[in-house]
Amino acid sequence: MERNISVEELHQIPTPKKEVEIVERKGIGHPDSVADGIAEAVSRSLSKYYIEHYGRILHHNTDQVEVVGGQSAPKYGGGLVLEPTYILLSGRATTKVGNDRVPFKSITIKAARDYLREHFRHLDVDADVMIDSRIGQGSVDLVEVYDTKKLEANDTSFGVGFAPLSETETMVLNTEKYLNGELKKKMPMVGYDIKVMGFRQKDTINLTVAAAMVDKYIHDADEYFNIKDELKQLVLDNAVEYTDKEVKVYINTADIKEDGKAVGYLTVTGMSMENGDDGSVGRGNRVNGLITPYRAMSMEAAAGKNPVTHVGKLYNVLSNKIANDIVKEEGNDIAEVLVRIVSQIGRPIDDPHVASVQVIYEGNVDHSKHKNNIRNLVDDRLAHISDLTMEFVEGKIPVF
């Protein structure tokens, strides 16, 4: 098979060398990320059930999860969740195989509850959320296309990836991971709903962090603002590991502390969805974990899509893998790589309509020596695209 692979040189300033760069990451507890995480957990559970009972992954797309914020009354020392967050599971799945009925509602609700319990320890899953599964049967046309032996694209869409990450992108990504990872041992009062906005102008990187605080760990406003000052220094200490540039850190900038009035970002569960903040699948991070307006991006939601033939999932992940592999294998001659893969419904997923690679080279590099290597690499990764399926099912590939 001769695939349509285009490799071309791109003449433009690499993103890290532009005057301004903006990067965002929504943390795991942000309502949009909660929706993404649940959608993907539901897809994984359905896939495992289908494999166990029928030997293959059957048609499903569970990428329509909505998080509708509840109501809470946080206060220093510990408040209350007054109304639970409503979580709607929607999409399509194979609900009947021959005469067998698939217990899809039980599977999907359990998957959502298990995901929330595993990741958000301050959330009472029995009382603080209400989960409703409205997942229905897929359309006949899509079910017919969804034949795992044919492995044909079930949509006409595209995926986008780039590499390498800039210092700003790396810093934003790892700041959130630090706050929702290692820092929790030292500062358990920092909640899971964290958003990091990075803005670089020339040689100064500004990090604005919104971090929900868990009220039961904080006794009063004075302690809250002391914690905030400590958190600012810890974020700065972590951030400077990724750059030699000047870094400025801002924490919870909507807080008020003036004229005897003190208002902070306080929550009961460490998640803003408890008090009116809503979320949807695909409205947050792309598959590389970032929102990058200075880069090419796909608007496709990857979380919850089937991992066998849905190119909105496969091509976005594969594009990023290809871009990173090119940078890794072709060495320091590469400044930046942009990969786009376009599908055509009904066409084999390993034979896209086009796989386009654009490369920004460092200095006066003879790019001809890289062109064939890149083409061969892309061809190989496309030939093995089906290897991604079980990695998705096993939760080895992040999609937000």
Curated annotation (Swiss-Prot):
Coiled coil: none annotated. ATP binds at G136, Q137, G138, S139, V140, D141. It is an enzyme of class 2 (transferase). Its cofactor is Mg(2+). One of its GO terms (molecular function) is magnesium ion binding. Pathway: Amino-acid biosynthesis; S-adenosyl-L-methionine biosynthesis; S-adenosyl-L-methionine from L-methionine: step 1/1. It catalyses: L-methionine + ATP + H2O = S-adenosyl-L-methionine + phosphate + diphosphate. InterPro entries: AdoMet_synthase_2, AdoMet_synthase_2_family, AdoMet_synthase_3, S-AdoMet_synthetase_arc. GO terms for biological process: one-carbon metabolic process; S-adenosylmethionine biosynthetic process. Gene3D superfamilies: 3.30.300.10, S-adenosylmethionine synthetase, C-terminal domain, S-adenosylmethionine synthetase, N-terminal domain. Keywords: ATP-binding, Magnesium, Nucleotide-binding, One-carbon metabolism, Transferase. It comes from the Archaea. Its EC number is 2.5.1.6. PANTHER family: S-ADENOSYLMETHIONINE SYNTHASE. Belongs to the AdoMet synthase 2 family. Catalyzes the formation of S-adenosylmethionine from methionine and ATP. This is S-adenosylmethionine synthase. It comes from Thermoplasma acidophilum (strain ATCC 25905 / DSM 1728 / JCM 9062 / NBRC 15155 / AMRC-C165). The lineage of its organism: Archaea, Methanobacteriati, Thermoplasmatota, Thermoplasmata, Thermoplasmatales. The gene is mat.
